[in-house]
């Protein structure tokens, strides 16, 4: 027997979905929180046990928030079915507030047979330290039960539309800025949760062997520092990594390079007029177009200095050399990564599990050769 549902609706109107699940990072007057959930019993076939929608108000008491309503309802059901394992998926218009995040973390710690994946359209008060800490506790992976939180991309919006919206047979049509907003929110969530890169991903993509092939992705690790009393002070809240967005039909039709995604992110930090230093560690040096855009950025933001350390030189047989020279001329520091930069990235951005950085054969030789090649490019030698 399934429990009785309260404070739920079966389907959402199309207009309500587009209004409430708009993924623009900063929005006002979105006071209703929608939580669409799917519960499956864990097993070989993973049958769906229930799909419903809870809703609540942002500024009401926490007990009326949809996350708390779900926990009360589901806890009653678990008392009668405590031996069953469940996989729970949420699609929420706002990520949980501090009290809800703490309550969900407590629930998961007490019931390890329940796994929870949370897809969020927007981040709620992500700039507040107490909120950041609550989400880190909820999603921490220190051997205990935890939630997995992700930003909704096109596929999740489409799934939510198909399962929970009264679409009247019409397909989901994304907003034009959905992929750009997704990139911003994904990077922000990575900063907030302090995501780390898989070791294999790092060694594969940052390997500086000159004969590397098949590496079509670009990874960009970044850190930000502020000048205070003649000392550069790290801003650890703005530290993370991202990668290029591959071309696809429903997101970026032409793709978007990692450098452009990074430039999209910087205004989101709302840096003031103090002096800042942004350092990027990239698996490939910028292409001509990205170099031009980065040059424009530092020209328009004189209080921000830019340092770029690249593992390899991106050679598209086009105007990449001109782009690098323009970027260098406009004030950016450009250099090839050497052992120190590789080790720093490994220690800072990689989920290394306590393992020290192990250089590959020829790292120093490749770095030296690439540095000589970059020097010749920047000095316009042989061109």
From Swiss-Prot:
Keywords noted in UniProt: Antiviral defense, Cytoplasm, Hydrolase, Immunity, Innate immunity, Metal-binding, Nucleus, Phosphoprotein, Repeat, Zinc
Location of the region described as Essential for cytoplasmic localization in the Swiss-Prot/TrEMBL record: 1-60
GO biological process assignments: cytidine deamination; cytidine to uridine editing; defense response to virus; DNA cytosine deamination; innate immune response; negative regulation of single stranded viral RNA replication via double stranded DNA intermediate; transposable element silencing
Catalytic activity: a 2'-deoxycytidine in single-stranded DNA + H2O + H(+) = a 2'-deoxyuridine in single-stranded DNA + NH4(+)
InterPro entries found in the cross-reference section: APOBEC/CMP_deaminase_Zn-bd, APOBEC_Cyt_Deaminase, CMP_dCMP_dom, Cytidine_deaminase-like
Residue(s) at site: Interaction with DNA: 244
Record-listed Zn(2+) 2 binding positions: 257, 287, 290
The protein's name in its UniProt record: DNA dC->dU-editing enzyme APOBEC-3G
Organism: Macaca nigra
Gene from which this protein is expressed: APOBEC3G
């Amino acid at each position: 027997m399934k429990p009785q549902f309260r404070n739920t609706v079966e389907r959402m109107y199309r207009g309500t979905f587009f209004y409430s699940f708009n993924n623009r990072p900063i929005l006002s007057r979105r006071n209703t929180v929608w939580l669409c959930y799917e519960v499956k019993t864990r097993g070989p076939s993973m049958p769906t046990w229930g799909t419903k929608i809870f809703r609540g108000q942002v500024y009401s008491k926490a007990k009326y928030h949809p996350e708390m309503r779900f926990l009360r309802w589901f806890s009653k059901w678990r008392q009668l079915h405590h031996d069953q394992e469940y996989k729970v998926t949420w699609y929420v218009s706002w990520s949980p507030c501090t009290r809800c995040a703490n309550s969900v973390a407590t629930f998961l710690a007490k019931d390890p047979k329940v796994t929870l994946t949370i897809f969020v359209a927007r981040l709620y008060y992500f700039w507040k330290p107490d909120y950041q800490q609550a989400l880190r506790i909820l999603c921490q992976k220190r051997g205990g039960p935890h939630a997995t939180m992700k930003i909704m991309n096109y596929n999740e919006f489409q799934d939510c539309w198909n399962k929970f919206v009264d679409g009247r047979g019409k397909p989901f049509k994304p907003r034009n800025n959905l992929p750009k907003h997704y990139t911003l929110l994904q990077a922000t969530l990575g900063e907030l949760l302090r995501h780390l890169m898989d070791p294999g991903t790092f060694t594969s993509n940052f390997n500086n062997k000159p004969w590397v092939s098949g590496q079509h992705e670009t990874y960009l690790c970044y850190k930000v520092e502020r000048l205070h009393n003649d000392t550069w002070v790290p801003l650890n809240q703005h530290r993370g990594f991202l990668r290029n967005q591959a071309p696809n039909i429903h997101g970026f039709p032409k793709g978007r390079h990692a450098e452009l995604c990074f430039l999209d992110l910087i205004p989101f930090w709302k840096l003031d007029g103090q002096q800042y230093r942004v350092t990027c560690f990239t698996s490939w040096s910028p292409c001509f177009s990205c170099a031009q855009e980065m040059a424009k950025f530092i020209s328009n933001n004189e209080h921000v200095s830019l340092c770029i350390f690249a593992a390899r030189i991106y050679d598209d047989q086009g105007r990449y050399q001109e782009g690098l020279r323009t970027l260098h001329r406009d004030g950016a520091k450009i250099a090839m990564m050497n052992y120190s930069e590789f080790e720093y990235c490994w220690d800072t951005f990689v989920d290394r599990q306590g393992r020290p950085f192990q250089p590959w054969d020829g790292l120093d030789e490749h770095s030296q050769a690439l540095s000589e090649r970059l020097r010749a490019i920047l000095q316009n030698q042989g061109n």
